[in-house]
């Protein structure tokens, strides 16, 4: 069930977020905890622990929002969450509410997160989707786009490790 997987990803991402505190702030004296330069220095010095947590945060939090966005789209209609350039036979079955066999399901391609959040935004803005969670996601559209960009920058280019105080 994608809903459960989404919340497992959220749980992992949040655990790692709180782990960054352990990786950095536990080693700071009380007077250093307000000094951003010292905090960022400790994060860099601890290196691997902070970076591991940081990567898990970006990957798993983005994964949660991607799965939940697609779930919201699918709840309205499965076609909102799939690539419309797919197999026309499968699309025909979906349009006519004909059950898909396992081979059809295997060949169904879901949209990328960036496209999914764009679709969700249009559906909410046009009153087609009125779900409170969908509205909340759309009200944070720029943040979700930035999160997706951050995750893609990390995964595909291995760049953009945020300083601890930016996180």
Put a short name on every predicted segment:
Residues 3, 62, 106-109, 113, ...:
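Intrinsic-disorder-associated interaction segments
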Residues 16, 20, 97, 123-126, ...:
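Surface-exposed polar/charged interaction patches
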Residues 18, 22, 69, 73, ...:
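Hydrophobic/aromatic-lined pockets within catalytic cores
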Residues 25, 29, 76-84, 166:
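Structured alpha-helical bundle/scaffold domains in large eukaryotic membrane-trafficking regulators
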Residues 51-73, 136-153:
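Elongated alpha-helical scaffolds
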Residues 68, 74-144:
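A broadly used, surface-exposed interaction patch
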Residues 127-167:
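Charge-enriched, short contiguous segments at helix-coil
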